[in-house]
Amino acid sequence: MTFSGFPPSAPRLYEELAAGNSKESWRLRHRAVYESDVRAPMEELAVELSAHFAEYAGGVRLLGPVRDTRMSHDKSPYKTYQGAYLDVLPALGFWVHLDREGLYASGRWYPYGGAEVARYRAAVEEEDGGAELAGITARLTGLGFTIGGDRLATRPRGVPAGHPRLELLRHRKIDAGRRLGPGPALGSAAAGAFVRETWELVRPLLDWAAARGLTPRPRGDRGADTPS
């Protein structure tokens, strides 16, 4: 079927789940709504996005609704969002999720360890590469994107306080995205267009990271750099 949006019951499910996240409430109240109003439309959206971005192998993949709580103090059994992703390279790709605040779409770089972060910081400090990334993120910010992701609260070791790209150097991960809130657009095909446009707009960011080898290298080729 063709993707035609998410009904109002979809974000409302996550509003209700935040207030009562239990296996019993899921079985009695939420599972059927999840399958019909969240999972099914997200699968339709994934098919359309996979076709549009067909140059990336593997297609868009959906996450399941159950949380892995083994290493978490929070034992709530179910996720409060429905996510889907398309990887361009390991630790680099596109993301979309639906939650109680609507739809969020982004491009993200999420390295596994210190070697990738060290290479990222070297690329940002390099004048041409750093200036290019600053320009990309400035354009995205001007289009309503938020440049988020895990980052240091202070400065990386050895970086002066007055460095022109200090904010970028603080990043250990990058998530550049924007949100479509609940409303008529979320319940129509416009939601799919929003995600496609968002992913197209973040391509330069992903291309920048891919061109500089900021994704995990084969095991025998990994450096020992450890960022601070």
Question: Positions of the model-derived regions?
Answer:
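Phosphate-proximal small/polar/acidic motifs at interfaces that engage nucleotide phosphates
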Residues: R27
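Gly/Pro-rich turn-and-neighbor structural signature
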Residues: R31-S76
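N-terminal low-complexity, intrinsically disordered segments
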Residues: G59-L62, D68-K79, A84, A185-L186, ...
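Aromatic- and glycine-enriched beta-alpha-beta binding-site module
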Residues: R70-G129
